[in-house]
Amino acid sequence: MPKLLLNMEVKDWDVFNKTYVLGDNTNRENAGIKKIFIGHEEDKPNKVHAIFDIPHTNAMREYMDNPKAKQMAQESGIKFETLFGVVCKD
């Protein structure tokens, strides 16, 4: 299964954690996206790194086409201009 590695900055870790990390597991899992890890750098709490199992390369893009997912991402405080992702395969 491919892995998606994401790096981003968020406005506030606590808001991001509550809204995105803890609050959207069901929607991600319904899209076949399984969270492996989401956390922040030890000395930079607004610098976030994430790893997901994804069923195919475009899974996260398709998931973000969902209006509820888009709204949740915006409310979580992701700074989209800093978002970088790469799909890896083993």
Each model region followed by its residue ranges:
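Short S/T/G/P-rich N-terminal loop/turn motif that feeds into the first structured element of a domain
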Residues: 1-90
